[in-house]
Amino acid sequence: MLHKKTLLFAALSAALWGGATQAADAAVVASLKPVGFIASAIADGVTETEVLLPDGASEHDYSLRPSDVKRLQNADLVVWVGPEMEAFMQKPVSKLPGAKQVTIAQLEDVKPLLMKSIHGDDDDHDHAEKSDEDHHHGDFNMHLWLSPEIARATAVAIHGKLVELMPQSRAKLDANLKDFEAQLASTETQVGNELAPLKGKGYFVFHDAYGYFEKQFGLTPLGHFTVNPEIQPGAQRLHEIRTQLVEQKATCVFAEPQFRPAVVESVARGTSVRMGTLDPLGTNIKLGKTSYSEFLSQLANQYASCLKGD
């Protein structure tokens, strides 16, 4: 009797353990939520997509927890921008085989699309701060998920990796990629139409994140408060922005939900400029088939609501 109970317990344990292992392994892990938006569209109905960075946290200063490292180790596929953006992931991802990772910044179709970072506006930082800035961002703007063109290339790369890992799901993965590309084309048209009347309206953003989106849709930023949001803008930079606000050269200044807007509020105080919020991470959007398109539309609405004065 005891022997039968032992065998039954062992069988149940194996089944439960096997199921848990399968659930833990059957996942795409994306570094940041917008990267997860792209991945979840391609993996929809095939495997789970999870996001490493918690809502409300910033990719600029996050530290991995032991549970995060386990998630990376157990993932079927890890998708991230690269060490210039998610420095906190560099060590564990470097131990993963190439077949189990997509590094967006290193994709051959993405490299020609990379934009240079803008450092010139922050010359009043001291030398130590400047060095930290350059180390963190490198030569290029790494907010790559804000480019629909790069998002399209990322989706193709994720599709290719998942087909290699899960060839039995090729038909579904093919359909998902086709749907994503069609949605993206439609959203680009819709966003372009919404933002077209706003070309020529000047504004300041909190940090140098939005260049890809702004270039694609013809927006005209006057500048940013800081290149790296971990570093407070210097007094000279704040004075320059304040002067342009007083002279009514800008319609809006934009803060971000991941950082306290005190410095933005103080510079705008007493002027007629409007304040808005841009969320470069799509914090309130859930992963799903249409989440990347929702993200682009939300960002466009955030620009438009302030620039139009709605």
UniProtKB/Swiss-Prot annotation:
Keywords for the protein's UniProt record, in alphabetical order: Disulfide bond, Ion transport, Metal-binding, Periplasm, Signal, Transport, Zinc, Zinc transport
Compartment list: Periplasm
One BP term from GO: zinc ion import across plasma membrane
InterPro entries in UniProt: Bact_metal-bind_prot9, Lipoprotein_PsaA-like, ZnuA, ZnuA-like
Classification via Pfam families: ZnuA (PF01297)
Gene induction: Maximally induced 30 minutes under zinc-limiting conditions, still induced in stationary phase.
One term of GO molecular function: zinc ion binding
Record: residues binding Zn(2+): 59-60, 143, 207
Cleaved signal peptide residues: 1-26
GO cellular component, one term: membrane
Top-rank lineage group of the source organism: Bacteria
Function: Part of the ATP-binding cassette (ABC) transport system ZnuABC involved in zinc import. Binds zinc with high affinity and specificity and delivers it to the membrane permease for translocation into the cytoplasm.
Name recorded for this polypeptide: High-affinity zinc uptake system protein ZnuA
Gene name of this polypeptide: znuA
